[in-house]
Amino acid sequence: ITTNAQVDVGSGYAMGFKAGAEPVDMEPHHFHPTGAAFPPAARGRLVTEGVRGEGGILYNKNGERFMQRYNPKLTDLAGRDEVARSIATEILEGRGTEHDAVYLDVSFLPARIIEERLPTMLDDFLDIGVDIRNEPMEVTPTAHHVMGGLRINNRAETNVEGLFAAGEVTGGVHGGNRLGGNALA
């Protein structure tokens, strides 16, 4: 599952590589921990970190708040990489839903809070027949971002004279665990 459109095929990387630009950190890929898994029309839709930030809880098919097992201090607010690995472990060890997912639930929050603080998520899920005010979302780690790209210096220059790179095609900027909201920084 990926959050990326089918037309996102790495053209920027390919153009740079073909011109002789040096790649860096191409092996790490960021998996967003909460991509929609079900219903099928939702697969790959990114479920914003704001859902957990507003108090959303993760639990497996057995109703267990499993993040307490992996990070008892931060639980559902642990870092994205840790949450993604924890969800994957739950699924691989047989505690995921029938759709290879876990539940992310905000239905215990007052409807007004969901409507005011998570309006996009509410609308996105209503469009596919899930009312997050009354039922949980099914989420799974979802391919989201390549951590590497073209190596640049502090002036956005690659090793190819006259070739500059910016945004998601650059590498050596994020490290192994990209911070939220800086994909185009």
What are the residue ranges of the model-derived segments?
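An anion/pyrophosphate-binding glycine-rich loop and adjacent beta-alpha core
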Residues: 15, 21-131, 135
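Short, intrinsically disordered, charge-balanced linker/junction segments flanking boundaries
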Residues: 1, 83-84, 88-96, 140, ...
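Glycine-rich phosphate/pyrophosphate-binding beta-alpha loops
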Residues: 1, 31-36, 143, 147, ...
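A glycine-rich dinucleotide-binding beta-alpha-beta segment and adjacent secondary-structure elements
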Residues: 117-170
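A conserved FAD-binding loop/helix module that cradles the flavin
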Residues: 1-19, 160, 172-185
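Short helix/loop capping segments that flank catalytic or ligand/cofactor-binding pockets
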Residues: 66-69, 113-114, 156, 160-161, ...
